[in-house]
Amino acid sequence: EPFVDIAENEKEIKITAELPGIDKKDIKINATENSIEISAEVKKEEKEEKKGYIRRERSYSKFYRSMSLPTTVDPSKATSKYDKGILEITLPKTKVEKKTSIKVE
């Protein structure tokens, strides 16, 4: 299971996940206003041929991570990048409307 860090500032939530050896085309991210899901499915096949024998090895791995977010975000404005095994997701917070007092009559 990948290591995941969640950081928060005034404007956004940043999620960093370590996904070494995974191709970015195998990563899927789904987000709602208060949660995020990161998953990947990796299938590899290695074939080695030498005189007199053939060796084939297959490997399959997958992971799924679902996390609640500490505050409400706008998933439609989320961005992500993947570089050297590190996935970074930025989720802008939704603007909280100012409270208005309502006079009871």
Predicted regions span which residues?
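Alpha-crystallin/small heat shock protein
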Residues: 1-105
